[in-house]
């Protein structure tokens, strides 16, 4: 499960400008994106 969260974190950091990763499964996985970059998940 940690691998999924780590992968989600990497994807968020590399794609957050598109604001496509902080939704659904990745956003639910510990809300990693929100913790790292609030602007990434603010569109939720």
Swiss-Prot record:
Keyword Iron set for record: no
Key words of the record: Disulfide bond, Secreted, Toxin
Cellular component GO terms held in the UniProt record: extracellular region
Tissue-by-tissue expression: Expressed by the venom duct.
Modification after translation (UniProt): Contains 3 disulfide bonds.
Broad class of the protein's primary localization: secreted
Compartment list: Secreted
Gene Ontology terms for molecular function: toxin activity
Annotated S-S bridges: none
Entry remark concerning the domains of this protein: The cysteine framework is XVIII (C-C-CC-CC).
Name this protein carries in UniProt: Conotoxin S5.1
Taxonomy of the source species: Eukaryota, Metazoa, Spiralia, Lophotrochozoa, Mollusca
